[in-house]
Amino acid sequence: MTRTRVEAVHIVWITAGLGCDGDSVSITAASQPSLEDVILGAIPGLPRVYLHNPVLAYELGGDSFMTWWYQAERGELDPFVLVVEGSIPNERIKREGYWAALGTDPATGQPITTCEWIDRLAPKAWAVVAIGTCATYGGIHAMQGNPTGAMGLADYLGHGWKSWAGIPIVNVPGCPVQPDNFMETLLYLLYQAAGLAPMIPLDDLGRPTWLFGRTVHEGCDRAGYYEQGDFASAYDSPKCLVKLGCWGPVVQ
C-alpha cells in the first residue's frame, strides 16, 4: 500500500477477454457513485480520473486509442489501475492464430493478445481489478470442454499475486457486474490512492468485504417469512423462495 497522495489516476480497461462487454455497459447505470461523477471530479477528495475503455471511448478508435496502452507499458501512466473484463484464454494451447487480442504491434503489425497485455501491464499497475464473473472466475467460457482453456484473472496471474503497491487482485463478480458494486470498489481504490483510505479489505476470494461479507438472505425483504418457516409454493408468492431453489442463505 502507498500513502503518497496522487493527483491523477488512469483506468486502463481491457475488454478483450472472452466476454460480451456487458460489464462495461452495466457500469453506465451506476448511481452510487455514477461513472460521470467520478470522471468529472464531482466527488471531493478524489484524484483526477482518466478512463480508457474501448467500449465507452466511442470517439477514439484504432491507433489513437491504443496510445494509452503503450504509454502504460512504458510506465508513463503512473499510477494506473488495470481493469480486466472477460475470461482469460490460454494462448499456449493455441497452435495457430490467437484466441483474443487488442490492437496490433506497431513494429510487426501482428495482433497483441490479451495475455500479452496482461503480462505487460499487470506488473506496472498500481492495482488490478477483475470485473464480472468471467474475469473473476472464468465464467461460462471456463466450462469443461471449452477449447480456449479459459480461466479467471487470479488463475492466470496466481492467487497470491499482488501489485507493486502490495494490493491483491480485486475481484468484483457478477453477470453482468452490479454497477454500484464496481463503482464503490473503484471509489475505495481511488480514495486509497489519494491517501484517504487504508488497504482495501478483501475476503478470501478477493472480493470487497463490505459488499460480499454477508449473504443475500441477510438483506432479503422476504427473510421474515424464512424465520417463520413460511415458504412460497409458487414463484408469484411474496413469501420466501428457498423451497423453490433460492440460494440466498448461502450466496454472498
Regions found by a protein language model. Give the residues of each.
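Iron-sulfur-associated redox domains of electron-transfer enzymes in respiratory
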Residues: M1-Q252
